[in-house]
């Protein structure tokens, strides 16, 4: 069964992530001890933005959730998380559904600040909130960061794509999944070099 809770806790009393439902409920945020919020939603107009009282520290990064986007924006978010945690201000990171943008930022933070490789960070979050599904562009950026930080890619784009296919089609055996992947490689890729390991 998929974990569809509004949020999950990554580091107790320090770091949480999820969807916009919790972000709109300041009473629940306060009960969790949240003092800082990162909003990653790309609003079509400012009237849609979630407003927060001034007692929350707030960062809004307007990020489009499309496969062609990279995750270069995540460093600014990780800096904010690091600073807030240092000042004992627990952080809630959210996007619209708590599936792609927020999980990307949390993985970036775990990789750059907690020294976890991409595979470890991804499966940690998958265990906490199994509906996470970062875009291929975000994962490509994190995979490149993985290699930069740790000297090799712990979780390649090909491995991620195969994992996603297997999760979508659990009754199909692995060899058939690989055949589907190879036949549809262009469909699942952003460009021809995305599958280079």
Residue ranges of predicted features:
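Cysteine-based protein phosphatase catalytic domain of the PTP/DSP
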Residues: 2-93, 97, 112-144, 149-151
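Short, solvent-exposed helix-helix connector turns and helix-capping sites enriched
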Residues: 25, 107, 186-187
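Short functional micro-motifs and their immediate structural scaffolds
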Residues: 100
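Short, small-residue alpha-helix embedded
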Residues: 103-112
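Generic structural signal for hydrophobic residues
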Residues: 105-106, 121, 161, 165
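Short, amphipathic alpha-helical interaction segments embedded in low-complexity terminal/linker regions
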Residues: 126, 143-197
């Amino acid at each position: 069964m998929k974990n569809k809770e509004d949020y999950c806790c990554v580091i107790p009393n320090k770091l949480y992530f999820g969807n916009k439902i919790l972000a709109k409920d300041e009473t629940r945020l306060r009960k969790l001890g949240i003092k800082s919020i990162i909003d990653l939603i790309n609003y079509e107009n400012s009237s849609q933005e979630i407003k927060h009282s001034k007692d929350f520290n707030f960062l809004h990064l307007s990020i489009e959730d499309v496969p062609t986007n990279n995750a270069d924006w995540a460093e600014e978010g990780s800096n904010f998380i690091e600073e807030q945690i240092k000042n004992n201000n627990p952080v809630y990171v959210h996007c619209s559904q708590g599936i792609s943008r927020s999980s990307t930022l949390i993985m970036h933070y775990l990789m750059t600040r907690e020294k976890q490789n991409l595979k470890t960070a991804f499966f940690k979050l998958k265990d906490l909130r199994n509906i996470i599904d970062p875009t291929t562009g975000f994962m490509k950026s994190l995979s490149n960061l993985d290699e930069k930080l740790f000297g090799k890619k712990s979780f390649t784009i090909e491995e991620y794509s195969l994992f996603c296919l297997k999760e979508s089609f659990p009754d199909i055996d692995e060899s058939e999944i690989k055949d589907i992947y190879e036949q549809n490689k262009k469909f699942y890729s952003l460009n021809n070099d995305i599958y280079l390991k």
